[in-house]
């Protein structure tokens, strides 16, 4: 089995070319794994597993790496791709220079917003704003994301009974009209350096 390690904004994944066969028990490998298979309706299919072995419907940084992977490995020469995911198809635009992908943008679709939910964790009440972009997120606006004990609060919010599917959690503070500071707890993976769908 040949693998490739890639990262998008610091989120690293192991990529497995499943176009010619791959293990059926992907969650059993228990790593942050993305398997690229033939497309159902699109050009390719992305199957994603979190570090704990749970299946992820969508990963923004992961799907950008899929675009780079399939182009740089010569599996396609298209610069506009449709990737099938468990959250539905996503369209990628690849910016190519000198035969290599330099940047990938993804149309994530329109996020679905829900009313805020209050959740208790570590003696504090957090106002969590549910947002769904193909996978569930909970955004908590706070003055200092860096001060939140993310390793303790993250798993409590992720697994709260208010969110039966579990959620990715982003603690965010608006610093200017153009800048947010964000810390991320991803369901099934824990603290990560970034989150494409959470952005």
Outline where the language-model segments fall.
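Glycine-rich, charged/polar anion/phosphate-binding loops
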Residues: 114-117, 124-127, 156-158, 168
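Alpha/beta catalytic cores of group-transfer enzymes, especially the acyltransferase/condensing modules
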Residues: 111
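Short acidic-hydrophobic surface loop/beta-edge motif
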Residues: 4-6, 81-83, 116-123, 129-131
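A glycine-rich beta-to-alpha transition motif near the start of alpha/beta enzyme domains, typified by
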Residues: 1-100, 139-199
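Short, solvent-exposed secondary-structure boundary/capping segments
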Residues: 100-108
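Internal active-site segments that recognize and position negatively charged phosphoryl groups
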Residues: 120-147
């Amino acid at each position: 089995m040949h693998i490739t390690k890639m990262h998008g904004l610091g989120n690293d994944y192991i990529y497995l070319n499943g176009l010619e066969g791959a293990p059926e028990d992907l969650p059993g490998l228990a790593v942050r794994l993305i398997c690229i298979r033939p497309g159902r309706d699109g050009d390719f299919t992305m199957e994603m597993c979190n570090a704990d072995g749970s299946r992820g419907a969508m990963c923004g940084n992961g799907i950008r790496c899929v675009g780079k992977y399939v182009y740089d490995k010569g599996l396609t020469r298209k610069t506009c791709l449709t990737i099938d995911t468990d959250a539905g198809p996503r369209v990628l635009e690849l910016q190519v220079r000198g035969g290599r992908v330099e940047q990938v943008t993804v149309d994530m679709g329109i996020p679905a917003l829900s009313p805020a939910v209050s959740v208790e964790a570590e003696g504090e009440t957090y106002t969590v704003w549910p947002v769904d972009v193909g996978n569930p997120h909970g955004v908590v606006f706070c003055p200092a994301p860096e001060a939140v004990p993310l390793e303790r609060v993250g798993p409590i919010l992720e697994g709260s009974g208010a969110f039966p599917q579990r959620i990715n959690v982003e603690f965010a503070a608006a610093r200017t009209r153009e800048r947010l500071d964000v810390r991320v707890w991803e369901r099934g993976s824990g603290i990560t350096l970034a989150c494409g769908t959470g952005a």
